[in-house]
């Protein structure tokens, strides 16, 4: 069956004011790029003509400049959920120019299924391959999964595919697509380890839901992170030493724990320090986002296997995966965010959660979303999904920010995302505050 080929501009003309749009991807990885940009251009034309045009945007997590950035600058977004890292979007949110709901990433697909965010009119999905078998289409995703299975199934008006030749023929066998059931009919998720497969390597949909295919050849808009510093390197070393001390004292199993690591230069430094510590056994990763350091640890064998939702890596690192794809099919799995961040699975398999704080207070509370308690930074992301259900929950940050002018350790947080009930340790470049088994005054 021949699928309808469209330009991004033709797709944009089919999107109407007030439509609810579900996108593939998780971080800039796997996000459609041509169509969102074309929608932003349409919005500018409509506004210049004096006509209203705004859409509601639902994603797995953050996106790239061609999506969050361009749509925001074109004033094309009315409502957005659940997470973003784009500086242009942040500026408009903090100026109260659009509506934004920050939520736990594990819950996004469920919120859509329950109808709490309205309906999904269109799904726009980046794919690496499309197989047509009878009246069904099998969609092979690219460098992330996010909420793609859910928005594909829910899309009332149809699905547009961005067939990205940059990934064509290279991602088959990496994904494990599984969607949980509706309440109250959910069954247990049949996973006891990070490398268990429970679904299919593709999304299967009725072929008649596909309204058109846009071809492109574009690399992911990989985020740039702050270069490692003496501070981040020391934090990484302190985390590795803390885990090693726990291992020696029998507080974590001899086989070690599965690691969840957040996003950014500190997270890369932590994984690097763990990989360099010979006394730490080889370990698995169960996380939402894989960064460059994890790819190297997989290739070296220090990481035995990694489960994630997204490959938030440079294109050079992605090409390493493609060059060694048969190896990575055995050692890497990409899942929907409601599985990669699922509290049930995290609690079962034994995870050490390591995330970054904006500020932490002397009671053990953590702020990870709002600067000075009022200005949104990015969002809670998956930090609560992992922190609240982990075997061991760690937050790290530099002791100061803004060139040493503002302390990150405060008497009481200006905003609290994670209460002391779920925070086991806070680590800076100066050391570790182990909060387990002590009272507030201690």
Segments and roles (model prediction):
Residues 1-442:
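Conserved alpha/beta enzyme-core scaffold
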């Amino acid at each position: 069956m021949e699928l309808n080929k469209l330009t991004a501009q033709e797709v944009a003309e089919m999107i109407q004011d007030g439509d609810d749009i579900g996108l593939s991807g998780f971080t800039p990885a796997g996000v459609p790029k041509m169509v969102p940009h074309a929608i932003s251009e349409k919005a500018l034309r409509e506004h210049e003509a004096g006509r209203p045009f705004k859409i509601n945007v639902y994603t797995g997590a953050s996106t790239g400049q061609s999506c969050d950035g361009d749509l925001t600058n074109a004033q094309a977004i009315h409502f957005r959920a659940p997470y973003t890292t784009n500086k242009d979007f942040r500026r408009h949110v903090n100026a109260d120019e659009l509506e934004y709901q920050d939520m736990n990433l594990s819950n996004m697909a469920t919120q859509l299924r329950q109808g709490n965010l309205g309906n999904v009119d269109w799904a726009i999905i980046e794919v690496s391959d499309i197989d047509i078998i009878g009246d069904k289409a099998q969609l092979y995703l690219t460098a992330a999964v996010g909420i793609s299975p859910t928005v594909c199934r829910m899309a009332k008006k149809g699905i547009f595919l961005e067939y990205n030749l940059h990934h064509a023929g290279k991602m088959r066998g990496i994904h494990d697509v599984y969607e949980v059931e509706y309440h109250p009919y959910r069954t247990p998720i049949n996973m006891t380890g990070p490398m268990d497969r429970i679904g299919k390597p593709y999304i299967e949909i009725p072929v008649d839901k596909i309204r058109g295919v846009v071809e492109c050849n574009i690399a992911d808009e990989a985020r740039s992170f702050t270069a490692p510093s003496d501070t981040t390197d020391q934090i990484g070393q302190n985390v590795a030493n803390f885990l090693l001390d726990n291992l020696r004292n029998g507080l974590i199993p001899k086989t070690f724990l599965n690691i969840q690591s957040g996003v950014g230069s500190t997270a890369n430094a932590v994984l690097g320090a763990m990989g360099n510590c010979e006394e730490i056994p080889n370990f698995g990763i169960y996380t939402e986002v894989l960064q460059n350091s994890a790819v190297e640890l997989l290739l070296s064998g220090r990481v035995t296997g990694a489960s994630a939702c997204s490959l938030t890596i440079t294109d050079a690192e992605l090409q390493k995966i493609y060059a060694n794809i048969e190896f990575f099919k055995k050692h890497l799995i990409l899942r929907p965010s409601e599985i990669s961040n699922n509290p049930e699975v995290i609690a079962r398999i034994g995870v050490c959660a390591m995330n970054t704080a904006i500020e932490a207070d002397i009671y053990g509370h953590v702020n990870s979303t709002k600067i000075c308690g009022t200005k949104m930074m990015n969002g809670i992301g998956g930090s609560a999904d992992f922190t609240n259900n982990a075997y061991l929950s760690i937050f790290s940050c530099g002791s100061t920010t803004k060139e040493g002018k503002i302390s990150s350790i405060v008497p009481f947080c200006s905003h609290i995302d994670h209460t002391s009930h779920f925070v086991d340790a806070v680590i800076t470049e100066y050391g570790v505050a182990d909060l387990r088994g002590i009272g507030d005054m201690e």
